[in-house]
Regions:
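Redox-cofactor-proximal catalytic regions of oxidoreductases
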Residues: 49-132
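N-terminal Rossmann-like FAD-binding beta1-loop-alpha1 element of flavoenzymes
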Residues: 5-30
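Short, hinge-like loop/turn segments at secondary-structure boundaries
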Residues: 46-49, 172
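Glycine-rich loop(s) and the adjacent beta-strand/alpha-helix scaffold that form part
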Residues: 23, 34-39, 44, 196, ...
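FAD cofactor-binding and catalytic pocket of flavoenzymes
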Residues: 62, 68, 83, 87, ...
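A short alpha-helix-loop-beta-strand transition element characteristic
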Residues: 65-72, 77, 127-131, 149-161, ...
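Conserved redox-cofactor binding core of oxidoreductases
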Residues: 109-222
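Active-site acidic short loop of glycosyltransferases
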Residues: 2-3, 257
Length: 361
């Protein structure tokens, strides 16, 4: 066997699995379809498509994967570190009513069960509250007051190292065992890729320590198939087939392992397992695969400001929020000064209706 465990995907689930397995002494390989970025490799603006967007068939090998469906457009991460390289650093704990959902409420006391793991994740990811007030926060406060909801205004818990802006210091989180860090400069480009080194991506914590413990992270490895070796239940191990994604078929590999962790995100995991089920490679996969898949219930709305002098970008990606009712949570979001390439994906916000009638509303 090449490894005791192969982890498919290097995002939040994959990085955590890789670290904990490596800490137990297993040999661990991590497969990631995207490339590996150093801080200075990230795009300087969203217009640098080759470093920002993920579409390898077009030669684009950036961090943002856009996946269209009939009624929704999904944004997800690509690259070593998965979603952590492109997300907005925010770390809210689920509200109590989430744990009361009938799909899982009777299975365990989830709020109690997850309290410890929440605390561990917050410590590992360096979660703290945004320590400043930005122009966007003031606008949101005014809007909340106009609705009588000013008491719901709160700053955001984020995985960002603030320190002294632009100043690089020895690791402040793990008694010096982690990488050097640089203080946030409030450029607002967290979701474009943090070129400063202030964003606590998984490369700064879970993956950093997983590699220190011996895990091998292999970038540019798109998994195409998983097959059991010998017994169909996988008790004899697995063969994982990969190829380098790109315009032309890249180098293909076969890697063996005693166990597999599939953690390729909600889209990637379901797509890979469905392909393996339908091809017969993993014929024992449940027919319920893909049911109850959920988004994170967010919609991104664009607002054009008439006055550019407000410097709404001078912040982290998401710095504050309000609740206008029990189910509606509004945040102020920025992509920074050079983050407007996605504006052409937006259109006018209309009321309810059909696909045809809304055009004229």
């Amino acid at each position: 066997m090449d490894y005791d465990w192969l982890v498919i995907g290097s995002g939040f689930g994959g990085s955590t699995s890789a670290l904990r397995l490596a800490e137990k002494g297993y040999s661990v390989g991590v497969l990631e379809a995207g490339r590996r970025f150093a801080d200075e490799d990230f795009a300087e603006s969203t217009w640098q498509f080759s470093r920002y967007l993920w579409a390898p068939i077009l030669g684009l090998r950036g961090i943002l994967r856009l996946t269209p469906f009939k009624d929704i457009f999904i944004a997800s991460g690509a690259g070593v570190g998965g979603g952590s390289v492109v997300y907005a650093n925010t770390h809210y704990r689920a509200k109590p009513e989430f744990f009361e959902n009938p799909q899982w409420t009777g299975l365990a006391d989830w709020e109690g069960e997850l309290d410890g793991p929440y605390a561990t994740a917050e410590r590992m990811l360096g979660v703290n509250m945004v320590p400043f007030e930005s122009p966007g926060d003031l606008l949101l406060q005014d809007y909340a007051a106009s609705l009588g909801k000013e008491d719901t205004f709160t700053r955001t818990p984020v995985a960002t190292f603030f320190g002294t802006p632009g100043e690089t210091v020895a690791d402040p989180y793990f008694d010096g065992a982690g990488p050097d860090r640089t203080g946030c400069t409030r450029c607002g480009a967290c979701m474009v890729g943090c070129r400063v080194g202030a964003k606590n991506t998984l490369l700064k914590n879970y993956l950093w320590f997983a590699e220190k413990a011996g895990a091998e992270v292999m970038a540019d490895q798109m998994v195409t198939d998983i097959q059991p070796l010998g017994a169909s239940d996988g008790s004899d191990g697995y063969t994982v087939r990969t190829r380098r994604p790109g315009i032309f078929p890249g180098r293909r590999r076969e890697i063996t392992a005693k166990g597999i962790v599939v953690s390729a995100g909600a889209l990637g995991t379901n797509r890979l397992l469905a392909n393996c089920k339908h091809s017969g490679s993993l014929s024992n996969i449940s027919a319920r695969l893909g049911e109850l898949v959920r988004t994170n219930s967010e919609s991104v709305l664009a607002v054009t400001m008439p006055d550019d002098s407000l410097d709404l970008w001078n912040s982290v990606a998401i710095s504050s929020s309000i609740h206008t009712d029990q189910d509606t949570h509004i945040e102020v979001v920025t992509y920074g000064q050079k983050g407007d390439a996605m504006r052409y994906l937006f259109t006018l916000l209309t009321g309810p209706g059909t696909r045809w009638t809304r055009v004229f509303s």
